[in-house]
Amino acid sequence: MFQQLQKYQWIIVLLIATIGGGLCMDAGHEWGDDFAMYLHQAQCWIDGGMHSLLSTNKLCMDESDGLVGPYLYPQGYPLFLSFFMRFFGLLGVQGLSLIYCLKWANYGLFLIVLVAYLRWLNRVFDGHWGKIFLAFVLVAWHPKIWEAADRLTSDLWFAGLVILFFQTLGTPFKGWISKSLTLSLLVFVATATRSNGIFLIGAWFVWEWLDYRKTESVDNRVVSLMMGTMAGLFALYADAGNGSNHWQLLKEIDAKTIVHNFGVYLEMAGSYPYWHLATLLKLLVHPLLWLAVLVFWVLVVLGFKTHNSEKWAMGVFVLLNFGLYIVWPSVQGMRFLFTLLPFLMVFFVGGLGVSWTRAGLPWLNRQSWIPEGMKSVKFVVGLAAAVVLVQGTMTSVFYTRLDTNQAFSKDIQGVYDFVDGQVPIDGRISFHKPRLMCYVTGLETYKIATDYGKETVGMDESVSGGLGLNAAIKKLRANQIDYWVLSKEQLARKEKPSLPIVFENKGFVVYAVAENQGSLTDSVKVD
């Protein structure tokens, strides 16, 4: 029985990952409106109108409070989505069903790419089953990866491209031109998905340099590297044409932010193998969490030291990305580390292997009371994999009971219907997710004074320091906003806006900001 399971072990691992991620998926989407912009751009690849979207979104981003997002996202991921949008559209799939199918396409392709990761691990660990299996399930079964299956963002797609690049980098080709073209294409698509895809060129340079020192053969390395560099730079140039405003954040870089981000990302990555336990430690005994994080990074360094020359290419890519994340003022969360996790898990498992050989196994052998079967590599690896699976299962069970469809809930759908049917085409709306409202209704939407009430729930305005009502209305009218959409949750305060209500349901209220836009007598109320 065990031999049969071992024969199909990788299929079983991927099947479990498919079920785990699938249980986390919900029809619709959570609030984050990055996905709405991705879908909007993907739709433009099918129907046209990208220039119009750029103009509209640029206006929205420039006039909204704070930095909401770029004028356009890099086109790699929207183009990927557009193929599936067209395919599912031909099958008649629309609405929330389309979003659900796109989630499966996004996650399913990542699972397919994990086959390349498996082949890469086989090369890196020289066929050592225990290390390969543990490193593989640490990615395939991890709760954060399964959780990401419920989001239409470029995280898994970009991580998959990086995995394919490194697998291709170490794979022999019959001809240099075919390998160079493949690597250059991957650099282009990765950089066209996220700007830090350009760091793959750094890893490529290191790989070729080390291989040159070993073989002393120049061959066509210079031409290959030039092809890859040109591909990456062209992708950056194409994205720069979108006028991305994210570079404004670089003005906020300071030493305090860098130190803070350094600690945040060290803790975040160091908590990855024992994610749920780390969350518990963070709430109860934070010093123990830092001890666990320290152990992780010690093992990563130890694993790095024991690997072959391929480690330098991986290490350069990890350090370049870590450097970018640390100096970037906005903390992005675990999803941005997805690209680095395949490498960190290789080093982490490598460090575990060294520790097991030098300390773990000798200690176990001295414990005569422990059964011999529990001292085997298969048992220890299986136990560690079970811990990862339990964490993933906890997340999947939690998501089956959680309705993550915030962006298309019944209440917000009522707002969309009102805006679509009652608001003039030239109406200007203020909503906390402007790109989502624009994608659904097609109307100009801005994020202006949408935090009104959030920071002052249950507090006097003088205590909270939040935006006052008069200041909010003045700001809205100065920006020529016609309709102000607020959630009732954020309006749990003493002073509610003294503006005409034109629409109201259990979750949201739409106020007419302009003095001639409506009155209480003609408002629409929905139970």
Predicted regions and their residues:
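Perimembrane helix-loop-helix junctions
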Residues: 1-4, 171, 175-176, 200-232, ...
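Signature aromatic-anchored transmembrane alpha helix within multi-pass, membrane-resident enzymes
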Residues: 9-11, 130-137, 181-185, 223-232, ...
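Transmembrane alpha-helical segments
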Residues: 22-23, 27, 197, 351-354, ...
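Multi-pass, polyprenyl lipid-linked donor-dependent membrane glycosyltransferases
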Residues: 33, 101-109, 137-164, 169, ...
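Loop-to-helix entry region of an early transmembrane alpha helix in multi-pass inner-membrane enzymes
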Residues: 71, 75-79, 89-112, 148, ...
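Hydrophobic/aromatic-rich transmembrane helices and adjacent perimembrane loops
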Residues: 148, 155-157, 161, 190-193, ...
